[in-house]
């Protein structure tokens, strides 16, 4: 199929197909685009080109807060059901793009690829993606500008998420609170389970450090909570809940990408 797609002028597509099937009567058809020329417009007008470039350069996709606990938590021995209290939720958040998007989605898919050994690749956030993050933050129509930055610790990409959080705090002149603590014995998450199991796995995964908890009630604005990749949203839901229980006001989640 790649060879078929790459056929050029003078290489008949129909002749290619019939020759591949050992047809002794294979001959140029005279009608396909390589024989008769493209039947579709081959030029793009300036307005369409500008619209396409604008779409490719677009940043910002929403992270909606979860409003209910998954069904079945009591069966796992966890007493959570019904609505998540409003005072424990995060506000609507943002990612730069979804992994399925064109434009920045391409760079983000490369960023979250794994190496030849099957392990996640970890490096500081690149300058182009850092600039896209700052654009996303500038275009965010939040009710109140954040006053501080905290981040979700990562076992797979610790350098990426810490560099992202530190860079945003420096650029925005925000207080850098640091990361949440990982609970002792925390292991890489199993991302193939359903919502109830995902929540179970992150429910006691994080802790608010004492030094951070002491500063939260004194902040003059929301906490910007940084993560690298949003998948089920349960990690951000629980991390924000911990921050709010520890005295934070609004929590605004932000990440590089969302899966799906």
Language model: regions and residue ranges:
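Structural motif
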Residues: 152-155
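Activation segment
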Residues: 231-232
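C-terminal helicase lobe
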Residues: 1-56
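Short loop/turn motifs at secondary-structure junctions
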Residues: 28, 145, 247-250
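Generic enzyme active-site microenvironment
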Residues: 225-226
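Hydrophobic alpha-helical packing residues
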Residues: 168, 172, 243-244
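Active-site-facing substrate-recognition patch
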Residues: 48-148, 158, 162, 166, ...
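PRPP-dependent phosphoribosyltransferase catalytic core
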Residues: 36, 51, 55, 237-260
């Amino acid at each position: 199929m790649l060879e078929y797609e790459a056929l050029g002028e003078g290489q008949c597509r129909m002749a290619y197909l019939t020759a591949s099937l050992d047809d002794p009567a294979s001959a140029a058809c005279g009608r396909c685009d390589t024989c008769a020329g493209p039947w579709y417009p081959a030029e793009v007008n300036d307005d369409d080109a500008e619209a396409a470039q604008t779409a490719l350069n677009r940043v910002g996709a929403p992270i909606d807060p979860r409003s209910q606990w998954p069904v079945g938590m009591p069966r796992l021995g966890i007493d959570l059901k019904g609505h998540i209290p409003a005072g424990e939720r995060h506000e609507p958040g943002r990612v730069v793009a979804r992994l399925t998007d064109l434009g920045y989605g391409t760079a983000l898919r490369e960023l979250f690829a794994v190496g030849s050994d099957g392990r996640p690749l970890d490096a500081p956030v690149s300058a182009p993606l850092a600039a896209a993050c700052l654009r996303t933050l500038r275009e965010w129509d939040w009710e109140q500008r954040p006053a501080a930055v905290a981040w979700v610790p990562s076992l797979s990409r610790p350098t990426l998420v810490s560099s992202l959080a530190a860079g945003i705090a420096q650029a925005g002149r925000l207080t850098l609170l640091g990361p949440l603590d990982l609970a002792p014995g925390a292991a890489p998450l199993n991302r193939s389970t359903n919502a109830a199991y995902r929540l179970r796995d992150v429910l006691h995964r994080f802790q608010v450090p004492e030094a951070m908890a002491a500063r939260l009630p004194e902040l003059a604005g929301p906490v910007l909570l940084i993560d690298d990749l949003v998948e089920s949203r349960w990690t951000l839901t629980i991390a924000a809940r911990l921050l709010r229980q520890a005295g934070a006001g609004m929590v605004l989640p932000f990440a590089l990408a969302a899966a799906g």
